Regions:
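C-terminal auxiliary extensions adjacent to catalytic cores
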Residues: 1-103
Length: 103
């Protein structure tokens, strides 16, 4: 990023970039959390159907954090709980293998 007409540009943008990356990670976690919450809500509509043990385990983890949505309610606490769920570090190995970074 030029700051002085391309002369003596010694300004590192790493700190700013890292702060932006932290915001992007949080925003992505909100999106993933909301998508998972919607998927869990959809699964509840017909619980006679079962999924894989891996999906069922994550479904149970989601339901520990967020109850079934029976009627309108303020969703900010649920969204925050799901953001924390999405940021967890202990994902099962098959899910970690699907991540681009294999984190």
């Amino acid at each position: 990023l030029p700051t002085s007409a391309n002369q003596e540009d010694h300004v590192s943008m790493a700190t700013y970039g890292a702060r932006r990356l932290a915001d992007m990670v949080n925003n992505a976690a909100v999106v993933v959390g909301v998508e998972a919450m919607a998927a869990a809500q959809g699964m509840e509509f017909d619980r006679s159907l079962k999924s894989s043990p891996l999906i069922e385990a994550q479904f149970a983890a989601i339901r520990q954090r967020v109850a079934f949505l029976e009627q309108d309610r303020y969703l900010a606490p649920d969204i925050d709980a799901m953001r924390e769920w999405a940021l967890q570090a202990d994902w099962p190995a098959p899910l970690r293998a699907c991540q681009p970074s294999h984190a």
